[in-house]
A protein has these predicted regions:
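N-terminal module-boundary/linker segments of secreted carbohydrate-active enzymes
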Residues: 7-55, 313-320
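Alpha-helical scaffolding within the catalytic cores
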Residues: 21-31, 103-107, 138-146, 277, ...
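Structural recognition of the beta-strand scaffold that forms the well-ordered cores
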Residues: 39-45, 74-80, 119-124, 154-159, ...
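Active-site beta-loop-alpha junctions enriched in small/polar residues
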Residues: 46-48, 83-85, 125-129, 161-163, ...
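Aromatic-lined carbohydrate-binding/catalytic grooves of carbohydrate-active enzymes
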Residues: 57, 61-168
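Extracytoplasmic
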Residues: 170-302, 486
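Glycan-recognition surfaces
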Residues: 302-309, 313-425, 456-458
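Carbohydrate-binding surface patches
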Residues: 413-416, 421-423, 458-489
């Protein structure tokens, strides 16, 4: 960890014994859009078709799903995974479909899919590029969310390839300035007006107004609080952070204004000048306001939480904006977090999305499917209505899985309250696969209105799962993992 101009004693203390974290990622309520209470049911292109998708394939798949009764069974989403998009954005910087494989554009495709009774879903990554190195959405959250909403997209999978984590370092702040939006002159508050917490310290610098700045706000270990920031009236104000330049590395800070967090990123800086300023627009109330400045990013998990929340709330704002602009009903977007379970999204996913991957990618290989089950089944307490553990898409009908293994795979996903996202070629599937994925009893268990994930009540060669259902009922599943017939008593 770099010192970042932290007071020498504080830096040594932090290295040797650590310091108490005084600024955590803000606690917020569950992410709610009203999109659906029960797990998603649909189809996705990735497991079978990978990067070989086009407009005709998607329309043929939707037609086959309707003809074979999958829409009636509940599979209402048709989702395009990676490689739907062009490698170049349009002249406005917006995402666009592949110019050759989706020549009609995405909005007309959405309209055709909707006309069949389905909803269309798309994919991007919480990074600079997608997993297949196409344009992604990190840093363009509001713009891309607006594009999705205007197209009428109703599901969005957000991967984690090419992610650039938020910096754990904070800038060196010597003052904040608050200016009523549209006005030239604002009120400056020198850092000496702030109350410091944790490792935050005043450091001397004769070249600055006020002769000092605050360091030690890094990695959640420090905080500075301005308790009496005055606003003449309630409204939008420009908050300017005046900083001392230091270090050739990015920095990050949250400005929490009356409990509402605003994020500010600071790029790697050249040192031609001693100081710099960075701004955001905040909401102030008439009279005195409180502004807290801190960097809560102490880990990759902290960074991921903030980045996924940013896209989640951009989607929520975009669908509302489009509905108001068109004077039409809102089409909320079901938001799928896909960071592969490495940063324990089951602990925070319900504040940032509707479903979250708990494992790396699935494969149509039986031992791998059992490993995914073994990890996901333990997380039963983290699933609730509108918020689900996602052990990845179904491989039923793919690879060389036997009928019994396909049935076991589907039944386990139903009991674990998992999203049921088909990954096979539904145009060509055999009748026995169709029989499995339209099993009404299992689908009813998955879609039960109580929305409880099954608990493994017995572990062994035969696992026993119990899933609470509405009306005081319980569904029980016996999963024979041994590979040989077992007598159950």
């Amino acid at each position: 960890m770099k010192r970042n101009n932290m007071c020498p004693f504080c830096y040594i203390r932090n290295l040797l014994v650590g310091a108490k974290k005084v600024a955590a990622v803000p606690e917020i309520e569950k992410y709610e859009t009203g999109v659906r209470r029960t797990p998603l049911m649909g189809w996705s292109s990735w497991n079978t078709f990978r990067n070989h998708i086009d407009e005709d394939l998607i329309l043929e798949t939707a037609e086959a799903m309707k003809e074979k009764g999958l829409l009636d069974a509940g599979y209402s989403y048709v989702n395009l995974d990676d490689c739907w998009q062009s490698n170049v954005r349009d002249e406005n910087g917006d995402l666009q479909g592949d110019l050759a494989t989706f020549p009609s554009g995405i909005k007309p495709l959405v309209e055709k899919i909707n006309a069949m009774g389905f909803k269309l879903g798309l994919y991007s990554s919480n990074g600079t590029l997608t997993c297949e190195d196409l344009p992604a959405s990190l840093g363009r959250e509001r713009q891309d969310a607006q594009t999705l909403a205007e197209w009428g997209v109703e599901y969005f999978k957000y991967d984690f390839c090419h992610n650039v984590p938020l910096s754990s370092y904070a800038p060196l702040i010597w003052a904040v300035t608050v200016t009523e939006k549209g006005e030239k002159q604002g009120q400056r508050y020198l850092c000496s007006n702030a109350v410091l917490e944790g490792l935050a310290r005043f450091m001397p610098d004769k070249g600055l107004e006020g002769k000092r700045y605050v360091s030690g706000l890094d990695a959640g270990k420090g905080k500075m609080v301005f308790k009496n920031v005055f606003a003449r009236k309630s409204g939008d104000y420009v908050l300017t952070l005046n900083i001392k330049k230091h270090g050739r590395y990015p920095k990050f800070v949250i400005a929490e204004v009356n409990g509402t967090p605003y994020e500010i990123n600071f790029p790697d800086q050249k040192h031609f000048q001693h100081t710099a300023r960075f701004q955001t627009v905040v909401r102030l109330e008439e009279g005195n306001n409180e502004i807290k400045l801190y960097n809560p990013v102490a880990s990759g998990k902290d960074s991921a939480i903030l980045q996924y929340r940013k896209m989640a709330y951009a989607l929520k704002a975009a669908t509302k904006n489009v509905a108001e602009k068109r004077n039409a009903p809102e089409k909320p977007i079901l938001f799928s977090i896909c960071e592969w379970g490495f940063r324990k999204p089951w602990l925070w996913g319900d504040t940032a999305g509707n479903m979250w991957r708990t494992t790396p990618d699935i494969r149509p290989i039986w031992p791998w499917i059992k490993l995914i089950y073994a990890r996901n089944v333990k997380l039963f307490e983290r699933s609730s209505a509108g918020h689900f553990n996602d052990p990845d898409m179904l491989e039923v009908g793919n690879g060389k899985l036997s009928y019994d293994r396909n049935m076991s795979h589907f039944a386990l996903w139903c009991f674990m309250n998992a999203p049921l996202v088909l990954g096979n070629d539904v145009r060509k599937m055999p009748d026995n696969v169709l029989e499995i994925i339209t099993n009404k009893s299992l689908i009813n268990i998955n879609q039960d209105e109580l929305c409880k994930q099954a608990k493994r009540v017995k572990k062994g060669r035969v696992d026993v799962l119990a899933k609470p259902l509405a009306g005081g009922r319980t569904a029980v599943l016996f999963f024979n993992k041994s590979g040989v017939k077992k007598k159950i008593s």
